[in-house]
């Protein structure tokens, strides 16, 4: 695997001033000290952060947090570190964590690429979820798409052997790119022939259910890190 440069001039997101509800603001202000992990650029010890030894998963760009909360609730035996840059989504997930009394989620409000490069040690993750990343549909913006070869190499370096990367998208041309990029990583192997069926652990969101009723498709791509890689 390549040496990963700390310099990253092209970001896969734009920080927009989204509407922050009063409930999201309160949750962000009151619950970040309890569930939030400040980003310092120093390595994190996930066993200490979660106060136990358990399978560890990284959730990248969780939106409003519905899927992340449902996954964590259904799998209390696992721990989930959730990275997101947008405050409304962070507040929304924190509110759900408190309401559902989840003890297996911690959040970090920072760019996931920096978190992977500087805060997570090699081979510390059992899985990575990247559900519905920004598709950047215009051709001139494709360079901003998160799933690129260098990023996948970085993800792979943080996975334990046997750990997996799961990406889901509802943009067909992005799905094709994701499948091509992950297929090009020599340390990964596809868990399916082409696209994978949606696994039971990824719940259908209300947005996705509505899209499916309208005939929209969703593509899941799941690759696993080879043993000995």
Curated annotation (Swiss-Prot):
Enzyme Commission no: 2.1.1.33
Catalytic activity, reaction form: guanosine(46) in tRNA + S-adenosyl-L-methionine = N(7)-methylguanosine(46) in tRNA + S-adenosyl-L-homocysteine
Residues binding S-adenosyl-L-methionine: 59, 84, 111, 134
HAMAP family in the cross-refs: tRNA_methyltr_TrmB
Species: Nitrosospira multiformis (strain ATCC 25196 / NCIMB 11849 / C 71)
GO MF, one example: tRNA (guanine(46)-N7)-methyltransferase activity
Chain sites annotated for binding substrate: 138, 170, 205-208
SUPFAM superfamilies the record matches: S-adenosyl-L-methionine-dependent methyltransferases
Protein name per UniProt: tRNA (guanine-N(7)-)-methyltransferase
Function: Catalyzes the formation of N(7)-methylguanine at position 46 (m7G46) in tRNA.
């Amino acid at each position: 695997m390549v040496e990963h440069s700390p310099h990253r001039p092209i970001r896969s997101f734009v920080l927009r001033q989204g509407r922050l509800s009063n409930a999201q603001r309160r949750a962000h202000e009151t619950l970040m000290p309890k569930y939030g992990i400040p980003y310092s650029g120093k390595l994190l010890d996930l066993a200490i952060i979660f106060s136990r030894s358990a399978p560890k998963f990284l959730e990248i760009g969780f939106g409003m947090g519905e899927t992340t909360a449902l996954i964590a609730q259904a799998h209390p035996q696992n721990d989930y570190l959730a990275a997101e840059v947008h405050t409304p989504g962070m507040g929304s997930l924190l509110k759900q964590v408190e309401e559902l009394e989840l003890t297996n989620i911690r959040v970090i409000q920072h760019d996931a690429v920096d978190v992977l490069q500087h805060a997570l040690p090699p081979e510390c993750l059992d899985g990575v979820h990247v559900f519905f990343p920004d598709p950047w549909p215009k051709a001139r913006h494709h360079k901003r798409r998160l799933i690129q070869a260098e990023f996948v190499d970085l993800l792979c370096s943080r996975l334990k052997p046997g750990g997996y990367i799961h990406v889901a998208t509802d943009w067909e041309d992005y799905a094709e790119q994701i499948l091509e990029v992950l297929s090009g990583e020599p340390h990964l192997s596809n868990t399916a022939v082409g696209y994978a069926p949606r696994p039971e652990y990824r719940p259908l969101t209300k947005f996705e259910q509505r899209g499916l009723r309208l005939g929209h498709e969703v593509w899941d791509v799941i690759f696993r890190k080879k043993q000995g890689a």
